[in-house]
Amino acid sequence: MIKAILFDLDGLMVDSEPHSIASWQAVLAKRNVQFDQAALDSVLGQRVIETAELAIRLFHLPDRPEDLAQEKAEYQIAHLNGNVTAMPGLHELLDFVDQSGLKKAVASSGLRRYIDAVLTTTGVRDRFSVIISADDVINGKPAPDVFLAAAKKLNVHPENCLVLEDAPFGVQAAKAAGMTCFAVPNAHSHALELSLADRILSSLHEVKTILLSDE
């Protein structure tokens, strides 16, 4: 029985992947290098620190991972307005979750400051009392840490949690946590491997329909 829904942020709740990519490319352009699409796909859903580590390895950059990750996050936050919007069906789904008495949390690979900024920009910050970020866990996705931490904070057993994800690493993390997972791929993740998910949906609108049919 589902008692809580754990929401990924980037690419699931908000259409932010293009802005995230543009932010990385802007930061790397200062160093005269650029990620290709394969590199970007390989880190989709991971923490910013892990993407920074990849950039440093690929391009032999002198930066510390922490500094590069912070620079990217600061650029991304500074340019949020007009570049990040709520995914179709998000507000309606949050209304349904609240009306149903289900618990909910954001469980994201993003830094906490970034998550707060995005949720505020899209008008849903006050709808979440539980937010687990990259700052709160040792291991990022595909490790299950972020989802297990969210379940613990909500006081809900993992088997009673439904994770909504858009990326392969997130789906792997959810299943490693022993949770049900619905994948909702977007334009950037639709061609990636999401077969571990319990269901693959076309939009957030479908989540309510499925939960109602399972009652």
Which residue ranges define each predicted feature?
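Residues at secondary-structure transition points
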Residues: 15-18, 35-39, 43-46, 63, ...
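An amphipathic alpha-helix signature
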Residues: 21, 25, 48-53, 69, ...
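Metal-dependent phosphoesterase signature
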Residues: 34, 56-92, 100-102
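Helix-loop "lid/cap" segments that line or gate small-molecule binding pockets
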Residues: 27, 47-62, 118, 150-151
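Alpha-helical elements of Rossmann-like donor-binding domains used by nucleotide-donor carbohydrate transfer enzymes
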Residues: 22-26, 54, 71, 92, ...
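Alpha-helix N-cap/helix-start and coil->helix boundary motif
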Residues: 20-21, 45, 49, 87, ...
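Active-site neighborhood of HAD-like aspartate-dependent phosphohydrolases
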Residues: 1-42
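Asp-based, Mg2+/Mn2+-dependent phosphohydrolase catalytic module
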Residues: 1-3, 95-98, 102, 111-215
